[in-house]
């Protein structure tokens, strides 16, 4: 008697299959992209996401006002039922969604004096040179689109 073959997918395989194909393809090609677990879960569950740029954190305001502003915007996004996906580059790796310590690292110019302002033209060089940087709206939009995030909010100083 033949038994049906059943295959159980691991939870990571189920998650991967639910992510946007552009993000899966970029990861498969070795693009250095890290998606925060909360953002990845929101993508899988089709929860509302808002992409946030980080240039205002790295270049727009002095510390600690820059950090307080970024955290305030993230809290506001959460208060309306969405998940914030603050986007930046750290050590040449694209971060879609930042940990609190990563956001502070980009904001604190005394401990990290070298973050660059990253527009779309600067992305490849920042990755190749393993730089840290705050993404402008144009660079943030590229990564948001890659991840399937349809809403972008820019911070204003």
Name each region found by the language model:
Residues 41, 54, 59-61, 66-125:
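Glycine-rich nucleotide/cofactor/substrate-binding loop typically near the N-terminus or early
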Residues 51-52, 88-90, 145, 152-154:
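Short beta-strand segments
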Residues 32-36, 62-70, 80, 130-137:
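Generic structural signal for well-ordered, non-membrane alpha-helical segments
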Residues 128-157:
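Glycine-rich anion/phosphate-binding loop at the beta-strand->alpha-helix junction
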Residues 1-30:
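N-terminal mitochondrial targeting presequence
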Residues 19-28, 48-60:
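Generic N-terminal amphipathic, Lys/Arg-enriched alpha-helix
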Residues 29-43:
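N-terminal basic/disordered segments at the start of proteins
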